[in-house]
Design a protein with these regions (language model features):
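Nucleotidyltransferase catalytic core that binds NTPs
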Residues: 1-203
Length: 203
């Protein structure tokens, strides 16, 4: 049996994520597919912010305790550092497993007791070289084949969505955010903006 998985921060979930998952689940019917949400969040520097912190402010918003963080697997407390309810909702229509790990090494260790012919990692074409280098650095490149997943919508990314929040571009924000999440994101948009404004004052 072949195993396929994808890993990402999903910060936040976009219609691009859902499109890619939809396409690949239908393409790889009758096999095991795993969606892995990366649960590693770096700690922010409270004394002096950097442009990188502003660009990835969701991570620092989480690590500063603005949003409650609990690290656990989906079958345990079912919590994600961003929002476990969003995770469950987004993948509720798919016959796949959702789990939380720190990195790709932990991902493959989860499957060590599962018999499979080959382990495949699906990613966007913009992440292909990056993931290959990471796997080589972790000495697990021989255990995983990295493939470009199909179904990704051009021009839609978490980066674009985060930039829309920073620019207070609510129209773009609503056009990219995964539809099931919209009802929760009015407060989130305000919270995110307040934090990025706070970071800018520290630069």
């Amino acid at each position: 049996m072949k195993q396929y998985f994808t890993i990402g921060r999903f910060q936040p979930f976009t219609i691009g994520h859902l499109s890619m998952i939809d396409e690949n689940v239908s393409e790889y019917e009758n096999i095991s597919v795993y969606i892995i949400a990366n649960s590693f969040i770096p700690k922010a520097n409270h004394k002096k912010a950097t442009k990188e912190q502003i660009k990835n402010a969701i991570e620092y918003l989480e690590s500063n305790g603005q949003i409650e963080m609990k690290y656990s697997y989906i079958n345990d407390i079912i919590s994600h550092p961003f929002n476990d309810e969003l995770t469950k909702q987004q993948f509720s229509n798919y016959n796949i497993d959702v789990t939380f790990v720190k990195d790709a090494y932990e991902a493959i260790s989860k499957y060590k007791d599962i018999k499979y012919e080959k382990l495949y990692m699906l990613c966007g074409n913009d992440r292909l070289d990056t993931y290959k280098k990471i796997l080589e650095r972790q000495n697990i490149a021989d255990k995983i084949d990295v493939l470009i997943g199909s179904g990704r919508k051009n021009g839609i990314s978490g980066t674009e969505l985060r930039n829309a929040i920073i620019k207070d571009d609510y129209k773009t924000f609503c056009s990219i955010i995964a539809p099931k999440n919209v009802y929760l994101y009015n407060d989130f948009l305000i919270q995110y903006k307040e934090y990025t404004d706070y970071l800018k004052k520290l630069i």
